[in-house]
Amino acid sequence: MAEKSFDNWKKIVVKVGTSTIVQENSQINLPIIGQLVQTLCALRNQNREVVFVTSGAVGVAINQLGFKERPNEIPRQQALAAIGQADLMAIYNQNFSFYHQITGQILLTYDVFDNPKMLENMLNALRELLKMKAIPIINENDVIAVDEMDHQHSFGDNDCLAAMVTKIIDADGLIILSDVDALYDRNPHEFANAKAIKRVGSITKQVINLASGKSNLGKGGMLTKLKAAKYLLKNDKQMLLLPGSEPDGILKALSGQEIGTLFANEYK
């Protein structure tokens, strides 16, 4: 991966999950959010177009309301999503304003991708935001998408949503920040000698078997990231899986440093 050049990544989708911005004790990780925003603004200063996909609305609300865990009742999850989304955007806007960076919120559901007219309208708005040098901030609309909140048709903590956005806007690549800093040959939480896999050219059954577990506050896990990677590889796109604990790793990886796992077709 050290020899890989990402200079041609001019349009990038960056996705962050709940486990990166909300800690296990339900506290909002403001230092990480600050570093992340600084990194996204640095990408903009490199004249790259940036689309930011974020999870965390429910996790933020859990913190704000002092809940111990994510509730199972869908109406309560909807209410938390509504509260948390407003708080989450306020936190992001406060951080982005320090760098005088304009942002715009886009909330999506599966219906948007299934409806050509709705999809066209969304893309028109997103393209205009990019022309304005704004950073679109995308999240799943959990207030409306009830079926997705009980995880029957979940985007997967926005991993698959980010992959679909990457494809539909013809971005050069997707970067996913995760609580796991790479894909490993075995579970790094259980095996101290687990080794990071630097590059994956196809999502085989063997690769899928490496995925296990998920965070308590979010809906995703390594399996949803592999699902996103498989979708992107099928559409001739690339994906980087990087540690969420080090947002500036995005800049290091794009400069060619060997960080995380790159998912790319063999001929890339």
From Swiss-Prot:
Substrate binds at residues 55, 142, 158. It is found in: Cytoplasm. Pathway: Amino-acid biosynthesis; L-proline biosynthesis; L-glutamate 5-semialdehyde from L-glutamate: step 1/2. It holds the Pfam family AA_kinase. Its main location: cytoplasm. GO terms for cellular component: cytosol. Its EC number is 2.7.2.11. GO terms for biological process: L-proline biosynthetic process. Keywords: Amino-acid biosynthesis, ATP-binding, Cytoplasm, Kinase, Nucleotide-binding, Proline biosynthesis, Transferase. SUPFAM superfamilies: Carbamate kinase-like (SSF53633). ATP binds at residues 15, 178-179. PROSITE patterns: GLUTAMATE_5_KINASE (PS00902). It catalyses: L-glutamate + ATP = L-glutamyl 5-phosphate + ADP. Catalyzes the transfer of a phosphate group to glutamate to form L-glutamate 5-phosphate. HAMAP family: ProB (MF_00456). Belongs to the glutamate 5-kinase family. This is Glutamate 5-kinase. It comes from Oenococcus oeni (strain ATCC BAA-331 / PSU-1).
